Amino acid sequence: QPQGRVAKAVLISAVPPLMVKTEQNPGGTPIEVFDGFRKALAANRAQFYLDVASGPFYGFNRDGAEISQGTIQNWWRQGMIGSAKAHYEGIKAFSETDQTEDLKSITLPVLVMQGDDDQVVPYKNAAILQDKLLPNSQLKIYPGFPHGMHTSHADTINADLLAFIRA
């Protein structure tokens, strides 16, 4: 049943319910990782965006990866366009905001998509939990796909998105 004007939703490599490790979320990522992101961002934002895109975001740090300089440069370009302050504060927002109750309240159909080689958002603490919390979800885990799978594997992701929307 649509909620207002929204009939369906999709989560792609999404962070909910909670990324940071807490007493209630023992499988989360230690706060020191996010502190490191903030430190790197504050020290040299341009290098931070090159390093993340060149490494874990698209899986370019994996043996045999086909590295796309265009993809790296485009991600860097997008990062540099945004506000440094917003990016810095965004790290807290995406890592420390508990969205458990929000997920439970979404009753419309939700497609949850994530790669099992996501080095940025571990799928077992994200997609698997999202699927359990969302009352009307469909889970798709993609073997070997990275966090940035919407770019690195666009044909597969787009086909599954369209199939979900049309169903």
Give a label for each model feature.
Residues Q119-N125:
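Conserved alpha/beta-hydrolase "acid-adjacent" motif
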Residues P135-A167:
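Catalytic active-site module of serine/aspartate enzymes centered on a nucleophile-bearing elbow/loop
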Residues I106, V112-Q114, D118:
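Short beta-strand/loop motif that positions the catalytic acidic residue
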Residues Q1-A43:
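Flexible "cap/lid" loop of the alpha/beta hydrolase fold
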Residues V20-T29, K39-K104:
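Conserved alpha/beta-hydrolase catalytic His-Asp/Glu region
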Residues V10, L111-M113, K140:
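Conserved hydrophobic packing residues within short motifs/helices of P-loop NTPase cores
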Residues D116-Q119, G144-P146:
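Acidic beta-to-alpha connecting loop that harbors the catalytic carboxylate
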Residues G82, V121, M149-S152:
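Residue-level signal for the nucleotide or nucleotide-sugar donor/cofactor binding architecture
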